[in-house]
Each structure stands twice: as C-alpha cells, then as structure tokens.
Amino acid sequence: MKYSFAISAGNSAMVQMEDYLNFLIDDSNTKVIALYLEGVKNPHKFEACLQKAMEKKKPVVILKAGRSPKGQATAASHTGSMAGSDKTYDAVFEKFGVIRADDMQDLRSTASLLATLRVLPRKPAFSAMCLSGGETAVSADTGFLHGIEYPDFSEATLKKLNDMLPDFATPRNPLDMTAALCYDADAFSSGITTVMSDPSIEMGLVGLTISDKVTVSNDIMFEGIRRAFEQIPDKPLAVMSFMEAARNKELVERFQNAGIPVLPTTKYGFRALQHLQDFILHDTIKCEARLAIPEAHSANTRALSEYESKKLLADNGVPVDLGYIAKTKAEVKEYAEKIGYPLVMKVESNDILHKSDVGGVMLNIKSLEQAEEAYDKILANAAQHAPNAKINGILMQKMLKAGTEMIIGLNSDPQFGPMLLVGMGGVFVEVFKDAALYPVPLNHDEALHMLQALKSFKLLNGYRGNPPADIEALTDMMVKISDFAYRKKDTLKELDMNPLFVYPKGEGVAIADALAVMYEEEK
C-alpha cells in the first residue's frame, strides 16, 4: 500500500485530529483516509469533515478506541478527548458512511483494498473464483457470514463455463475453477473474464495460495489475472491470499503495482469486502448529513410528568392523546363521559416516573363505578408507596387497542446531540437488546433503514399469517420525533415512549406513555 502521508498526531495539543482530517479530505493525492481515533475535541469540525468526505465520496476508515470502559478511560487520559459512548460513535459513523475497523490489521486491509481498487463496484455483487473445492467452500461460507452478495450466473455464463471446465466441475457462484486452469494463463484469463463479463457481477475475487513453497504456477496465475483485469476495465478485481504467513511477497507486490489488491487471509479479506459493500450501500440511502450538536447546557435536569411530556410532544407536531387530569370525583365523571369507555387511569406526578411500581396504573376501566374505585385506589397506592410525592391528579385517557409494541427513545449525547433509538417492545429490547440507534435529524429513508436493521423486522413485515404493520406511519412518527428533538437539542436530555403501539397497515400508530427529561436553565 502506498502512502501520501503518515502522520503521528501526538497528544494533539496544537493541531487536532479534525485539522488533519480536513486537510487529507481536500488532498488530491490521498484516495483513502485511515485513522486511529481516541475521541473528538471539536464535534462541529468533525461533522464538517465527515460531510465533506461524504460529498467527495472519499472513504474514511477509522479504528476507534473505547469499546470497553478501560479503553475509554485510557483514551480520555491520553489526549483529553471525550471518548463518548461507543454506540454513539457507531451511529455517527453509520450516518456519514464512515467505515469502522475492528483492529489495526482490519484498518490496514480495508484501507489497502479501497486505495488499490481501480474503480469501486457499482453495486455489491461479487463472484469468488478459486482453484480448489475447499477454497471455494471456505469462500462461500465466509462470504455468507459477512453478508457478501453472490448473485447467480446467467445461463449464457454457465454455458461458457461448462465448455471450458472439466466434466466433473459444476459452475456456480462462488466458482471452483479447478486446478486445470492454473497451468495455462490464457485458460485462466478466459475463465475469469467469462465470470466478470456476466451482467450480474460487479467485482471479482480470485482465491489463491501464493506461498513461497508453491511457485510453479505463480507467473501463470499472475499473467492470467492481469490479462483479465485489462480486458474488463470497468469492473475491479482483487486477490485473496489463503496463506498469509508464508505468502510470496514479490508476487503480492506485482499484483499491487498492477492495481490488483491482495487481501490477507479469509478473515480480514472478507471483512474488508464487507466494509466495501457497506460503503457502496450507504450511497443508496438518502441521508440527512448533519447532526443536532447542542450548545453547552446546565447540569441540572427536571423530569416531566406524563401529561407534561405528551403536551410538549403535541406542541411540537407529534400526534398524541393528552387525556385529562382529574382532581375530584366530579371531574372523574365529567372526563369519563367525554372520553368514553374503556379507560386507563394513571397517577400524574413529576415525582413518580415509574407509575406501575407504585400501583399507579389501572387499565380497561369499563364503567363510572370502576373509574371512581380506580381513582381512590391509585391515590391510596401512591400515598402508601410514594408518601413524599406531589400528586397533580389522576390522568384519564382512552384505553388504546392492542398492537405491536415498539419502543422509541431519545438520549442526548453531550458532543453529538440527540440519538434516536427504536426497537421492539418487551423482551426484544430488554433481553435480546434488539434496538437500532441513529443520530438526529433523520428522514424517512433513514427511519426505514433503522427498522430494517432490527432482527425482529420480519414481525413488522407480516409473519405467519399476521398482517403487515403500518411501517409508513411508524417511520412518519420517527421523523416527527426526530424533528422535535432537533428543535429541542439544547434543552432535551431524554425522551422515552414505551410502549408505542403499531397497528396493521393503514391503521396508524399510537403513543401509550411518554417521559421527557429536560435540562434546566441556569439560575
């Protein structure tokens, strides 16, 4: 791999990482930026850099320290940068198409692949071509584990391959080219060219064992790959080395100089291809390429009651049923007649955030008698379990019909601003941690992308006879909540909407409960 610059930033006391990044994005001799990052000192500059890299389609590959608590502590003490939440960095990187490397070898392998490729594939559609059945099977399995797309060959391609391969070979993608082709550069080149000419294939991967101990066919393989590479100028080729430790370094250099990257081992090779695939797919999503970076705010916070939280949402364009706060039995009767049955009644208090824990919620109330009993019981429970809480009254609302339970939340990162979280309710988010996190603001494409990232997305799409959920209404709700968070980026700390019911397609969504925590102004 060739370098335009190799920069050691030290402790970044004078020139910061964001300054180097900005310079390298503008530098025409730098094709790919590989960066070790401990933290960000200037989030506004960092945002501007990522926006520019995205506009120029210049890949940025980052090895970010701080996946563990000790890693975060070490990074913070080293440079004084804010390490920040690791998941927040993942979300910011995803928004701007930044590739996050797992370790130093992954950083190098991915940067080398992107820097050496003559052109990038137009879409993620790969073919792996190997010289043995074992290597072909490994390529198929490892590619599958990394989500690599292997399209089927066309009938025309299959016919051509059948004509050139031995009778015992069965052409498919990934392709076992058999050892018969590696002793003839013309035959080897013809096999690769046939595959690369298939309209469904955008990039080829040739698996080789280029060991110092097996050199008989090295020149033939190099020449065959080079010829194919020249015949298909609009599609990239890469070589996968199956034996990294003993590979022929001279041959690797010949490939690299010809513009054909050599990927080290299947582990790092397919991980680099996965990064490449993600980078290409990022272009297919229309992104709001900006963040909601907050100004400095007070350390003091105040939790809003459910009614106050919902009122805040309603005032900012988020559809929600406010209900009524009853402070007397007479008001219970008045509001019950206005709302209609069945009802839900809840304790309304800024001091009781988890109402169910104190017996402060009564569901499915079907008559005035039950409503009056619920009023008395909720007040008694609150007095018993939260005697010091100030009670504002009893919140009365229409009982929502059951739907698919989702959770939507917001949490404001001190550097990058509000992050929107979405996941299935209940055990999916609590036990399986099946949730997606993404920076505000977001649009409908990004909201849908978040939902599709959930392991449980199939449940929303209709599963085993259940109707598909109203995904359009759900993404619309996510965008409205994102817009709200963007407007309140300087004052909002947290927002939790759990549960949010999603109904069948065409029937909408409904927020059942909401809790907002706001930063208080300095006095």
Please provide the spans of the model-predicted regions.
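Catalytic-core regions of core metabolic enzymes
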Residues: 1-523
